[in-house]
Swiss-Prot record:
The gene is Osgep. Keywords: Acyltransferase, Cytoplasm, Metal-binding, Nucleus, Transferase, tRNA processing. Widely expressed at low level. Expressed at intermediate level in lung. Weakly expressed in testis, skeletal muscle, kidney, liver, spleen, brain and heart. Substrate binds at Y130, V131, S132, G133, G134, D162, G177, E181, N266. It comes from Mus musculus (Mouse). One of its GO terms (biological process) is tRNA threonylcarbamoyladenosine modification. Its EC number is 2.3.1.234. InterPro entries: ATPase_NBD, Gcp-like_dom, KAE1/TsaD, Kae1_archaea_euk, Peptidase_M22_CS. Component of the EKC/KEOPS complex composed of at least GON7, TP53RK, TPRKB, OSGEP and LAGE3; the whole complex dimerizes. Its main location: cytoplasm. A divalent metal cation binds at H109, H113, Y130, D294. This is tRNA N6-adenosine threonylcarbamoyltransferase. Transmembrane segments: none annotated. The lineage of its organism: Eukaryota, Metazoa, Chordata, Craniata, Vertebrata. Belongs to the KAE1 / TsaD family.
């Protein structure tokens, strides 16, 4: 019954998780929060991660009721993500692996989300909608790869929402996306915004540029409220995501859809995806913020699968990479 310790820190969340044979034993997390109207810089984020990571490690072991002797493998996020935060966490993972004399595993962040989603929901072979601040992909498993059927051709949907939040100076606590979701519930008017779907791919830069340019003017003239803009942006970008996911499901003949990534916590997105799945006679799987948002347990779970399949990452190959596509990884642990 191997136990795997996972380190995640590819963006403004840092987490340390422990997983043993499909059971999450611990999953503490911290978030680097900046002032309204601002984003988070790589260097500042890395400093935050370095300041809290050892406390999180101790917290995870205590919560799991384990010691270093009980851990069989150390997993960490190899990429994709922001360079400085990734590097700061990878250094700790390598150090711990050497001090404890444990094997090391570099995990693809995207695959961590997928494997955690499969574990928590019980989805068998779903079409995956992976939506976060740095990634937007529609994925399906085939022949030992997670194949990307569609994706953003510019910025991620979460990045679009985060940057819009800066325009309205919406709070980043607990996250701009969550606060947009709450404001959208009070929106009453649907403002027409650019809708850009190109086959299986989507584009969010145009809708962001439009709303950045028009927001203050529309608010000043009383044409709409901030809540209306939040509502309109959500409805438009989520409709785009539902469209390309349905197209992928039709192509694959899939009867399961799984939403993963931080934006996947959004209940309105889950509602729209659920309606689409119901109309197709399919089933929707999603998790709550404990497992949708970046966390250490997802890296531990993917690491556990890789460890069981015989994967190891030599120290010389453990450098982080900011660009690490989902379909680069050979998924040897699935049939």
């Amino acid at each position: 019954m191997p136990a795997v310790l996972g380190f995640e820190g590819s963006a403004n969340k840092i987490g340390v998780g422990v997983v043993r044979d499909g059971t999450v034993l611990a999953n503490p997390r911290r978030t680097y929060v900046t002032a309204p109207g601002t984003g988070f810089l790589p260097g500042d984020t890395a400093r935050h991660h370095r300041a809290v990571i050892l406390d999180l490690l101790q917290e995870a072991l205590a919560e799991a009721g384990l010691t270093s002797k009980d851990i069989d493998c150390i997993a960490f996020t190899k990429g994709p993500g922001m360079g400085a935060p990734l590097a700061s966490v990878a250094v700790v993972a390598r150090t711990v692996a050497q001090l404890w004399n444990k094997p090391l595993l570099g995990v693809n962040h995207c695959i961590g989300h997928i494997e955690m989603g499969r574990l928590i929901t019980g989805a068998v072979n779903p079409t995956v909608l992976y939506v976060s601040g740095g990634n937007t992909q529609v994925i399906s498993y085939s022949e030992h790869r997670y194949r990307i059927f569609g994706e953003t051709i510019d910025i991620a949907v979460g990045n679009c929402l985060d940057r819009f939040a800066r325009v309205l100076k919406i709070s980043n606590d607990p996250s701009p996306g969550y606060n947009i979701e709450q404001m959208a519930k009070r929106g009453k008017k649907l403002v027409e915004l650019p809708y850009t779907v190109k086959g299986m791919d989507v584009s969010f830069s145009g809708i962001l540029s439009f709303i950045e340019d028009a927001a203050q003017r529309m608010l000043a003239t009383g044409e709409c409220t901030p809540e209306d803009l939040c509502f309109s942006l959500q409805e438009t970008v989520f409709a785009m995501l539902v469209e390309i996911t349905e197209r992928a499901m039709a192509h694959c003949g899939s009867k399961e859809a799984l939403i993963v990534g931080g934006v996947g916590c959004n209940l309105r997105l889950q509602e729209m995806m659920g309606t689409m799945c119901q109309e197709r006679g399919a089933q929707l799987f999603a998790t709550d913020e404990r497992f949708c948002v970046d966390n250490g347990a997802m890296i531990a779970q993917a690491g556990w699968e890789m460890f069981q399949a015989g994967h190891r990452t030599p120290l010389k190959d453990s450098a982080i990479t900011q660009r690490y596509r989902t379909d680069e990884v050979e998924v040897t642990w699935r049939d």
